Amino acid sequence: MPLTPPPDYTRVYTALAIGASIAFFTGLITRNTLPSVGDLQHNLPHGGRYRDGTKSVEYCGPRKLNSVESGSRWTFQPWLLVIVLVALIIALGRQGHNCRACGRSH
């Protein structure tokens, strides 16, 4: 009986890892994290006003994207900080590195 190598399952594991990653990130991105306002019949997640004979609800909606961002417009925005840092890294990386011996860029 000839010896045969065991089957290679790396493609199966790679496909499972990619599928699980896509499912995880899709669930993470599409998750609703807005505060729930209203009752079972009247839900106002993006703001609004509802009034009937016995109750009234007025909700102005969220003013910021998440709990990390501040309430003001441009003081501290995490995405703006990331963009500025990436631009700074790219700009500093493009500076020519000159040779200390001859002064030229190699």
UniProtKB/Swiss-Prot annotation:
Segments on the Lumenal side according to the record's topology features: 30-73
GO cellular component, one term: host cell endoplasmic reticulum membrane
Keywords: Host endoplasmic reticulum, Host membrane, Membrane, Transmembrane, Transmembrane helix, Transport, Viral movement protein
One Pfam short name: Plant_vir_prot
GO biological process, one term: transport of virus in host, cell to cell
Subcellular location: Host endoplasmic reticulum membrane
UniProt xrefs under InterPro entries: Plant_vir_prot
Parts of the chain that traverse the membrane: 9-29, 74-94
Source taxon at top rank: Viruses
Parts of the chain on the Cytoplasmic side: 1-8, 95-106
Miscellaneous comment as given in the Swiss-Prot or TrEMBL entry: TGBp1, TGBp2 and TGBp3 seem to act together for cell-to-cell propagation. TGBp1 is the main movement protein that physically cross the plasmodesma with the viral genome. TGBp2 and TGBp3 would facilitate TGBp1 function.
Family assignment from sequence similarity: Belongs to the Tymovirales TGBp2 protein family.
Known function: Plays a role in viral cell-to-cell propagation, by facilitating genome transport to neighboring plant cells through plasmosdesmata,.
Protein name: Movement protein TGB2
Native source species: Lily symptomless virus (LSV)
